[in-house]
Amino acid sequence: MCYYRYVQVHSIWRRFCALGLLVPFLLLLFSCTNTVGYGVLQWSLPDLGLSTGDILPVYVRSNVSQVYIVEIQKKKVELPFWQLKLCRTKKEALQYAERLREYRYSYATSVLDGLPLREGPENTAPQVYRLREGQAVKLLWKGTGKAVYRGENRLEGDWFKVMTEDGTTGWCFSHGLSLFDERESRPTVRETDDLARDRDLQHVLNSAWYPEYYRTMVEQRRIDLEKMASGWGLFVGEKKGLARIELPDAHYAFPYSRLVKTGSNGYLFDGSSLSIYVRDAHTLAAQFTDEAGRLRIERFVTLEKTPEEIIAEEQLRRSALLEHVCTPGLRLHSEIYGTLSFTERNVFTWTGARALSPALIPAGAGSTGRVALRCFIDQSLKSEYEGVLSFDFDSAQEWVHFLYLRTPGGLKLEHIDSTHLKDATVLRRSVSPVVLYFAPEGHAEPQP
């Protein structure tokens, strides 16, 4: 009975996660219980009337989304981990807020390109980050550090613990910073009259910007065709005054009146919550507030080839490999698992597979369908298998996946549960795998 109840609860939990209902469920759960702690704001949110040092009750910590869910003006709002310091008790939160009090409204911009942030308050400490000229940082507190010299001359300034707009922290010597109070002034802003001569902006306007994970897929040579399309990315829309961010699971539109440059690498879409920060020639970060009041940061990149070209090459690669593995006319047989044959257009027929249903192949799935190469295997599995064959049975609603290895005597398949897949990659084998051996029809079945 206890095991049955565990299975029921585990099944319900997995369904909440799969349906994207985990955060709403946690909100409902924690709305009736105590908070998980108190968050001290480390970077002001002027749009919400909040400043550094403000304390907010934290209801949920989501390690998956890397956000805290807090209450602001009687609304639940998501804030990224870096923007809050989570404390277990109100007393701890008050102590941390007191530490931030002296420089609560103090920010700074770098007057040098490449100004380093260091692990400690001394010029010989390891570097953790380099600031671009004009990049803004938050001053957290002043520290006692070693003097800094240029030749024999001691430079004026202090060591500050600072934070960048993406949460990176380090120690920075103030000689290379221009400090300002957020209540009185902002970093120098250049109006749009100068933007026509701005090389960074012209590069932004003349380039196509795609989700950062596109580049990761290209570098790893793991192109997930379901997560790549030319219509996803950042679209500045300069002529229409309408910027758009299109993602697989979300759409955002930002009507704006003009582009305003902030510092050396930041641009504000005036009239909207959208700002972009150019990291390098191929990367930028977009920061905005979504319809739920959550601060979001999305990164976008340029590519050497268009998504259409990348998709076409991947489709060609898969087609050639699949034809080599599942050659039309090939018939494979197993005494236990039936006969598997392939014909043109990646069509398969699998008869006599009753031993696999319903545990692996859904009941009523039928015996025909299409086979495809849709997934990849983790590097740790490449010594044992070549790849993944995915079977789409005509009367089933879910794909059935098998690791495969071509052998001199036929084909070896190993069933993979969909829970072992992440980002279209098989991460691990099952604890007790079901392994199938097939031989060409008329030949002896290969042995394990």
UniProtKB/Swiss-Prot annotation:
Keywords: Membrane, Transmembrane, Transmembrane helix. The chain crosses the membrane at residues 19-41. Pfam families: SH3_3 (PF08239). It is a single-pass membrane protein. It is found in: Membrane. It comes from the Bacteria. The keyword Membrane applies. Gene3D superfamilies: SH3 Domains (2.30.30.40). One of its GO terms (cellular component) is membrane. Disulfide bonds: none annotated. This is Uncharacterized protein TP_0260. It comes from Treponema pallidum (strain Nichols).
